[in-house]
UniProtKB/Swiss-Prot annotation:
UniProt name for this protein: Cytochrome c oxidase subunit 2
Primary localisation category: membrane
Pfam families on file: COX2 (PF00116)
Catalytic activity: 4 Fe(II)-[cytochrome c] + O2 + 8 H(+)(in) = 4 Fe(III)-[cytochrome c] + 2 H2O + 4 H(+)(out)
Membrane topology note: Peripheral membrane protein
Purpose of the protein: Subunits I and II form the functional core of the enzyme complex. Electrons originating in cytochrome c are transferred via heme a and Cu(A) to the binuclear center formed by heme a3 and Cu(B).
EC top class, as a word: translocase
Length: 135
């Protein structure tokens, strides 16, 4: 059941945990520079590096093509956050220093709202982002 659940949801099992230094993640690399955050890794595959911080997401908006396999790699430099994309089964907890990885293919174009569903401080209720899926 665990294998089916993790495969169906597109979640990478915990044995493949990736880590980053939360004190320097904003200084260099794909999480620090929104211009480097969306990387085409194959003919119809993209990796998106998302930084969840108090109280927002970077990059914002995130633009991806419809029908492509998207691998989100999400981390935080400060506190625990959530990364839930409304209208999808994407829902991961984001811990400082750890990279939460999830795969998803958007079958429909449009705008999808990202919300933080882990209380992260006084501005939590304003923590939103947007994914724009283009045809």
């Amino acid at each position: 059941a665990y294998t089916l659940a993790t495969h169906t949801a597109g979640v990478i099992p915990a044995g493949k945990l990736e880590r980053v230094d939360p004190t320097t993640v904003r200084q260099e690399g794909p999480w620090a520079d929104p211009a480097q955050a969306v990387v085409q890794t194959g003919p119809n595959q993209y990796t998106v590096y998302v930084l969840a911080f108090a109280f927002g997401y970077q990059p914002n908006p995130i633009e991806v093509p419809q029908g492509a396999e998207i691998v989100f790699k999400i981390t935080s430099p400060d506190v625990i956050h959530g990364f839930h994309v409304e209208g999808t089964n994407i829902n991961v907890e984001v811990l400082p220093g750890e990279v939460s990885t999830v795969r998803y293919t958007f079958k429909r174009p449009g705008e999808y709202r990202i919300i933080c569903n882990q209380y992260c401080g006084l501005g939590h209720q304003n923590m939103f982002g947007t994914i724009v899926v283009k045809e």
